[in-house]
A protein has these predicted regions:
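N-terminal amphipathic/basic leader segments beginning at the initiator methionine
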Residues: 1-41, 45-46, 53, 77, ...
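Short beta-strand segments
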Residues: 45-47, 69-72, 119-124, 183-189, ...
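A glycine- and small-aliphatic-rich helix-loop capping segment at beta-alpha/alpha-beta transitions
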Residues: 57-67, 83-86, 106, 110, ...
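Glycine-rich oxoanion-binding loops at beta->alpha junctions
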Residues: 72-115, 155-156, 160-161
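Internal gly/pro-rich beta-alpha loop/helix module
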Residues: 136-222, 234
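Accessory alpha-helical/coil subdomains and C-terminal extensions
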Residues: 176-182, 204-285, 289-294
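Conserved mixed alpha/beta catalytic, RNA-binding, or beta-rich assembly cores of soluble enzyme
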Residues: 292, 298-301
Length: 301
């Protein structure tokens, strides 16, 4: 193995990951021109596997929040954060702690004025961790398990989840109104579809009831009358109280990798930031590119 190439690869990977770490992403978003907090209270709601780190960075950057809640996966709380209560809950299937912590968040944002700002920090895993079901919790857990076992992709999963929830599909933003929401989103889905990341609690929903019903039929979900009615009920399509800053995405990671390659003297070519397939298929694809360059007498790393 070429030791120099291996060292360069390690450097490129480290530089790329550093650019999309939660703390760096939050600092970047809070320093942007898009962040304009109101004159009133500042509340923080952080949800996802990176919620604690995002909240810790946000509070340090802002100096204070009036009140806050972190909802993250078991084992992911690293300590206390001033003014913030931290909860751990179930992932990838929501549990009673998910439901209880989400209820606390909803209570916190009740009766806010239009002078208040809700800083909403969202990362991967939010669909399970942030949940107030519109159907019995046990039924939601069973449907989630069936979708997981059936091989449903994240878009299919979240299309169903949004309609069975009081906080997903833009409904959390409605609960916060008339307060303004500044949402910082760490994207864990290719293409950054905002309404699908953590099932879009503060984003207008682009999916339809017809799509949800089709997915339910595809995976033969045993729906109660209550659940079936929820799937046909439409979600918010317009939200006027939300500003969203997407960061920490695959696109940003790819750009950081390109910059690191160039710094090391390579001529980088970004083939795609949307590759979605099995690892063996990706390996075959990259191998064919390497063979093409080798056949033309070109160097390729």
């Amino acid at each position: 193995m070429n030791t120099a190439l291996r060292q360069d690869a390690d450097t490129i990977i480290a530089s790329s990951l550093k650019a999309v770490l939660p703390d760096a992403a939050v600092r970047r978003a809070l320093g942007s021109e898009a962040f304009h907090p109101q004159d009133g209270r500042i509340l923080l709601v952080a949800v996802g596997k990176a919620a604690w780190q995002m909240a810790h960075t946000a509070v340090a950057a802002l100096g204070r929040v009036d009140e806050g809640i972190v909802i993250t996966k078991y084992g992911h709380v690293r300590g206390t954060i001033p003014g913030v209560t931290c909860y751990e809950a179930g992932h990838p299937v929501p549990d009673e702690n998910s439901f209880a912590a989400t209820e606390k968040a909803l209570t916190m944002v009740q009766n806010l004025t239009d002078k208040a700002t809700v800083l909403f920090l969202l990362s991967g895993g939010g669909s399970a961790l942030f949940e107030k079901p519109l159907i019995p919790g046990a039924e939601l857990q069973e449907l989630t398990n069936r979708l997981l076992a059936g091989g449903a992709d994240i878009v299919e999963m979240n299309t169903i989840r949004k309609r069975l929830s009081a906080v997903k599909g833009g409904r959390f933003a409605l609960a916060c109104a008339p307060a303004k929401i500044f949402s910082i989103v760490l994207s864990d889905i290719l293409g950054d579809p905002l309404d699908m990341i953590a099932s879009g609690p503060a984003v207008p929903d682009s999916s339809t009831g017809e799509q949800a019903i089709a997915i339910a039929r595809k995976y033969r979900l045993p729906l109660s009358k209550e659940a079936n009615a929820c799937l046909t009920q439409e979600t918010p399509k317009v939200l006027n109280n939300v500003t969203t800053q997407i960061t920490g995405s695959v696109r940003e990671l790819s750009k950081a990798a390109v910059d690191a390659c160039r710094t090391l003297g390579y001529t980088p070519v970004l083939l795609t930031d949307h590759l979605c397939c099995e690892a063996r298929e990706a390996g075959s694809f990259l191998g064919s590119i390497a063979r093409t360059h080798a056949g033309q007498g070109q160097k390729f790393a």
